[in-house]
Amino acid sequence: MDKATAVNTCLGVLKGRDCIYLDKVERDGLNNLTFTGDINGHLISQHRDEKDWFRYTLPFRQVLAYFACELDTYENLAETGHLNRSSFDLIEDSTWLKSLPVREDFNKDIYRHYRLFTYDDVYNIIAVSYEFAAEL
């Protein structure tokens, strides 16, 4: 069963609907998916209130699959309110990852399921790793 665990970033835990603002999502030819935008400096657990906004870059590496959904629709789909929880989670024991019919030459054990709540949308991403960087 899916278990969401908050990802601890260089800004600490990112929390709430107004925390992550997205300017751009880019996918390159190497299966990397990169998010860029701003983090609300009042909705983080470290460096809180030092700045109103922190620029961030969040590339996911070796992306196997991802999907996006409008936030309110996603919450209705999941039948759970999420607005005051973590905005960036690692989904442990992921049902979606377990059910993916990957190629035989792929090692499914190296992949992780991440969930990112932005102001407008929710992204579920299956990737090998990520790197979160913010301008402190």
Give the predicted meaning of each segment.
Residues 1-136:
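Surface-exposed, interaction-prone regions used to assemble/regulate multi-protein complexes
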